[in-house]
Amino acid sequence: MRKTRLTFIAALACIMMLGCTHQPQTTIEKIDCLKKQVVVDADALQTIANQDFVKLQKDFHYCDSLLQYLDAKVVEASFEHLNLTQAYLLQFKEVKPVMEKKMDYVVEQLGNLKSDAESHYLSDSLVLVYLDTETKVADTLHAQVEYFKDSFSKCQASLDQLKKSKK
């Protein structure tokens, strides 16, 4: 009877320990996944800056120079699109460095958080609190990247239409 009770207690302790060690592993996987998301978003931001932004800016200047040669109705219809494109370009120039710094900081914080979680320096609940905070920042950054992708795509389509009207 006593041996059975000890075996049961030992088995219960093992199950509890496995349950405790499983949670940080899941948390570590979440940290790694979030870190990968931020790195992918940082790469996407660089692609936007190096390709989409450059092309959009070039096409914007080209279309702006076309206005003097176009019909007044086309100019009037295009003017709003050109102003909107210019606003997105200026916004991107201002926001991009801030986004890059935030992305670098989040990646660094997630690396520190993973280290602290693996070494049990922080409690599981505190790790989850920090992870939630970093997740909110990462989600905001992701939304900003998607916003610029979408905005630049729409602006590019508008400029392409204007370029066609010249031909």
Region roles according to the model:
Residues M1-C20:
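Sec-dependent bacterial lipoprotein signal peptides
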Residues Q57-K102:
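Structured domain cores in non-transmembrane regions
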Residues I9-A11, I15, Q37, I48, ...:
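Low-complexity, intrinsically disordered/propeptide-like segments
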Residues C20-E76:
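Immediate post-signal-peptide N-terminus of mature secreted/exported proteins
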Residues A87-K167:
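Extracytoplasmic electrostatic interaction patches
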